[in-house]
Amino acid sequence: MEAMGEWSNNLGGMYTYATEEADFMNQLLASYDHPGTGSSSGAAASGDHQGLYWNLGSHHNHLSLVSEAGSFCFSQESSSYSAGNSGYYTVVPPTVEENQNETMDFGMEDVTINTNSYLVGEETSECDVEKYSSGKTLMPLETVVENHDDEESLLQSEISVTTTKSLTGSKKRSRATSTDKNKRARVNKRAQKNVEMSGDNNEGEEEEGETKLKKRKNGAMMSRQNSSTTFCTEEESNCADQDGGGEDSSSKEDDPSKALNLNGKTRASRGAATDPQSLYARKRRERINERLRILQNLVPNGTKVDISTMLEEAVHYVKFLQLQIKLLSSDDLWMYAPIAFNGMDIGLSSPR
């Protein structure tokens, strides 16, 4: 390998003209066999030396010489190369190890080159690297680094976005929890206020109902007291009416306890009256109530609706009893007593 490297350096540095290189290569390669044919051959050269192609092959080295307008390719059509400047250039590919029982075939499938251009001679020439047979695509190092940087920046941006979202979500949750607590406190306060208002309303309604009941009871008692009459003689009734009228007028004018009784308050709360008028009126009311009880039990099958009807029925009943007593006490008319008892008028007027 060292010998071939020296030859390549000598060829690249010493022989600059096409004719001298052709003569030298004819003499040099006369003793070597072509790797594909097994015989020693030179090269195919044109008259103007534009199609010159030299191939120096062995088990370990590979040397190629290309003319000004020519081009060459590596084995198995792995890559292509084009030269655009003047002069001849030599290219020495990398060394490939080979087994003893196999022939040397240089393949670019297993070699990966990340560069797109080679600096040869005075000027630069570009080598367009195509896809290899293995399906891999070569990319320049700068683009790979840029892509890697772009991916890292994208990852960092995503991480920052997720962190900001999580922070905003936590803030929103905390705000939502605080607002929920405030709402619950307000609802509880409103419920308590409503309960208190309903309790107050219920108490007020109960008090109003009690006062209404008391007023009704007092009104009924007053109506009974006003409608009560006495079953005394006309003189006693007139006296009682006069006394009652005078008492009522005097009590309305002088005694304010009656007004309090109309409002539902009892007189016992203010103490018992000791004046003679109030004592007389109390005795009179008690006597009237006793006579009303006797009247209710006296008339059979009475209506007991109001005191006026009760009095009328009592009067008719008393007249009926007087007639029956008259008929039964006479010797001539006793037979008419049952007829008069059944309600038939026989023309006998009851005595007055």
Swiss-Prot record:
SUPFAM superfamilies: HLH, helix-loop-helix DNA-binding domain
Expression (tissue specificity): Expressed in roots. Expressed in root epidermal hair cells.
GO biological process entries: regulation of DNA-templated transcription; response to auxin; root hair initiation
Region (Basic motif) residue spans: 272-285
InterPro entries registered for this protein in UniProt: bHLH_dom, HLH_DNA-bd_sf, IND-like
Record region (Disordered): 160-277
Domain (bHLH) ranges: 272-321
The protein's name: Transcription factor RSL2
Gene this chain is encoded by: RSL2
